[in-house]
């Protein structure tokens, strides 16, 4: 259970290099059952002192006032708080030369100036120091004292009364102070262009408007915060969402793997955490290869494949996804290499894919044939569509035929998700998959994995002949009339 929680945390990190390294480490530990290593202020008064007295720990010092607990309508003024921090006086003409050397001892707070005017001194300025790194003159090391002596600085540590405001608190500090004690605090979200997409839990819903406004305030570039509701569109599998804060404009622009996409986030599916997986599949393709994308969405497989000079046949049942797929092909200047379709995935397999497979089968054997790939990225249902490939080319010869490689995605809540997905794929195909590749994509929830299974479509499935009863000839039941039972002598012990 602890490992699954770690996977859930690392699997939901944004797509950065560091996050991807952490994900790979977590997934590796999952397989070996090992845990990874623990990984506008205003001044009010100024007074001299010899040493700073020990106070609360850092979390308490930088926690907003307890009165904000349970707030359901954001009141920024309620976060004003006075704290005491150490300061030293430094002459104005040398302060810039000293700041770099003192950087590691300065106070670190959002929107807080660390050098301020001293109203009683025209010659010096006050430098705000970190109260947990500087307690007294003894907190400075030898190199600091050499520097002070060089610039004729008297490093007298004094106490300064600093008023923190809402702007000086971090997002997680505010939310931790507002939400009830002992409950999970979320400040994480998926960023989709200017939209912050959150998945709030039930106990957080009474505070959703405060959470949304804080996320909006603390993240430059975010102009809209939305929350996924529990309602799912049964036809297109889209989650409904509500706007918690900011504008209601859901048409956004994102960049993924050097490709630009535009779409209406409220009407299509887009997951910014899948960029690495999209790139992994595109890595299997080379120029002149062919990609069939059964559940194409707005084009995260189709567009980069076309940019790689592949021929692409992309389909999606959702009319909005189809519209934005066409738009993104034009936006990235690959519309001539992509044929888009707006139909059911099963129909796409039985018509378009079948037709194109036959076309490539008729290519002269002397001509270099491309590799064929079929992407099926609808994890909730894609495995169930695999039976559409059974006897797809029932009446066609299979000699010298190019067998396509299928990349099929699925969710699993099983203790062994890789084996579970493989077994279900084999069940819908009606055959065993001796040579397949299993890839753990990401942890969707503490007990839910997203898996990709890749395999060459077996010729026994693609060219399976059916009898008049609609069953494979090799699996027709042997009736007593056709095969009389031999006489078996009864054993004495029976």
From Swiss-Prot:
Domain of life: Eukaryota
Compartments it resides in: Mitochondrion matrix; Nucleus; Cytoplasm
E.C. number(s) listed in UniProt: 2.1.1.228
Keyword Transit peptide (UniProt): yes
UniProt main location, coarse: mitochondrion
Entry keyword annotation includes Mitochondrion: yes
Alphabetized Pfam families for the sequence: TRM5-TYW2_MTfase, TYW2_N_2
Positions of the UniProt region annotated as Disordered: 468-494
Catalysis performed (reactions): guanosine(37) in tRNA + S-adenosyl-L-methionine = N(1)-methylguanosine(37) in tRNA + S-adenosyl-L-homocysteine + H(+)
Family membership noted in the UniProt record: Belongs to the class I-like SAM-binding methyltransferase superfamily. TRM5/TYW2 family.
Record-linked HAMAP family: TRM5
Name of the protein in question: tRNA (guanine(37)-N(1))-methyltransferase
Organism of derivation: Xenopus tropicalis
